[in-house]
């Protein structure tokens, strides 16, 4: 966060989900600790001590060193807080408008340490941040944090009262055919259904005692009515908003009996729509195409990523929306690793690793932690905005939004990006870098010149100038 802006002794910044002011002039106030818990359990934030309530006037603290010592003493008292997540650099004494304030940066706690609670009570001392306030966590909030804190895979538990015969056989057969076509010599291909499902993480047990579906197996291969008996909030939804009105023009949703409603069948239903909405009528084979475009791969990656990372006990379900110009996917559950680490690639922490394994066996999850990085790299190559991630606290969800420019605009974007970076770039350079034919590049460049998006200065030995529009 930038330094505070002071106007006539008043701090112009307002309290927010990640910013809080406390009076604390003479001593550390009791309401410091609910905010500490709330920031740690939500998105993190900064607390300034020495700011008058209501007026936001910087009044300072009388003895900042004493306040800092008290904070550290109580942070290391397990009767007061369940965990100290601060480093020495997180607490500092600063001067604002001539008076001393104490600045406390509270990072978001790692998932293994949440919930962070106070006064020795997880039930009564766990808080979350919502808007400008600190609120008690509900039992559902606490349960969700405890699920995330566990090192056990959320989708590995066996589903009581079910047998693998309760799974949708057609879905299992379709999955096995697809895997066999992609991995014809895989050693699991010859196994019977029970042992095959155990090996891929969809079942637990053995041949003599029988096999029980895991949660991953139920989600991948079960009927949606059976899934909802164990996960009442389960719902997968895909909507297109391609008309001139405000409502959706096409919808694929679970729970209506038109297809089995499990994750695998949902992906097989949605894939042709993603292709059609990309105005790409070539042959479709489930989620795969002969000429799968990079933008289609990005959209598929974001959808698969949401399905793998969803907290299916949370609220809201997985929802994909396609509007003119953008595509978004929302899943229940917060981020389990920092966004910066996720965008950098190379590390993944899925809630449902067994679902990830099954999708990797049919080519939908390729490399650990590389999917989001691939999408970001493709956006940079096209010269469009990076995927935007939004996380909400109540309900806890993650939404990612991706720009989807029309095909002509999409082809123009990498050309403009290259010209903006190097005005001396040639048509042949662009053709080689983008994979587009020289004649196609020429047509797009001519159109952009006519529309005023680019300009050529200096003839054949000149340079390109991109006009920001």
Residue spans of the language-model regions?
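Short beta-strand "wing" residues that participate in macromolecule-binding interfaces
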Residues: 456
């Amino acid at each position: 966060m930038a330094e505070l802006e002071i106007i006539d002794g008043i701090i112009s910044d307002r309290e927010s989900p990640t910013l809080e002011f406390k009076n604390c002039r003479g001593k550390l106030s009791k309401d410091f600790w609910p905010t500490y818990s709330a920031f740690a359990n939500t998105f993190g934030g900064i607390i300034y001590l020495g700011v008058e309530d209501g007026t936001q006037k910087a009044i300072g603290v009388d003895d900042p060193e004493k306040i800092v010592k008290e904070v550290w003493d109580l942070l290391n008292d397990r009767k007061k807080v369940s965990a100290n997540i601060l480093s020495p650099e997180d607490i500092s004494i600063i001067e604002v408008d001539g008076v001393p304030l104490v600045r406390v940066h509270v990072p978001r706690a790692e998932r293994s340490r949440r919930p962070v609670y106070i006064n020795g009570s997880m039930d009564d001392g766990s808080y979350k941040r919502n808007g400008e306030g600190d609120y008690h966590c509900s039992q559902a909030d606490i349960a969700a944090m405890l699920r995330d804190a566990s090192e056990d895979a959320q989708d590995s538990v066996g589903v009581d009262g079910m047998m693998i015969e309760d799974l949708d056989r057609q879905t299992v057969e379709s999955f096995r055919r697809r895997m066999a076509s992609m991995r014809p010599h895989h050693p699991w291909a010859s196994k019977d259904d029970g042992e095959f499902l155990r090996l891929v993480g969809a079942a637990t047990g053995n041949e003599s005692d029988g096999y029980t579906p895991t949660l991953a197996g139920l989600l991948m291969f079960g009927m949606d009515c059976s899934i909802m008996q164990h996960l009442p909030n389960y719902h997968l939804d895909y909507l297109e908003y391609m008309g001139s009105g405000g409502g959706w023009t096409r919808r694929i949703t679970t729970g209506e009996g038109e297809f089995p409603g499990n994750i695998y069948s949902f992906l097989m239903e949605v894939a042709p729509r993603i292709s059609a909405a990309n105005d790409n009528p070539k042959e479709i084979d489930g989620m795969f195409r002969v000429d799968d475009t990079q933008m289609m791969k990005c959209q598929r990656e974001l959808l698969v990523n949401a399905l793998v990372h969803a907290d299916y006990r949370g609220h809201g379900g997985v929802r994909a929306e396609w509007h003119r110009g953008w595509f978004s996917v929302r899943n229940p559950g917060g981020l389990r690793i920092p966004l910066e680490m996720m965008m950098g690639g190379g590390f993944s922490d899925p809630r449902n690793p067994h679902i990830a394994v099954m999708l990797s066996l049919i080519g939908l999850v390729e490399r650990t932690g590389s999917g989001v990085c691939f999408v970001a790299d493709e956006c940079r190559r096209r010269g469009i905005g990076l995927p935007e991630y939004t996380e909400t606290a109540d309900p806890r969800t993650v939404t990612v939004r991706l720009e989807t420019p029309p095909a002509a605009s999409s082809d123009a974007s990498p050309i403009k990006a290259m010209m903006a970076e190097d005005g001396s770039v040639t048509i042949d350079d662009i053709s080689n870098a983008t994979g587009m034919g020289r004649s196609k590049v020429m047509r797009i460049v001519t159109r952009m010149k006519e529309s005023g998006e680019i300009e050529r200065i200096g003839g054949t030995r000149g340079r390109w100038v991109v006009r920001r529009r």
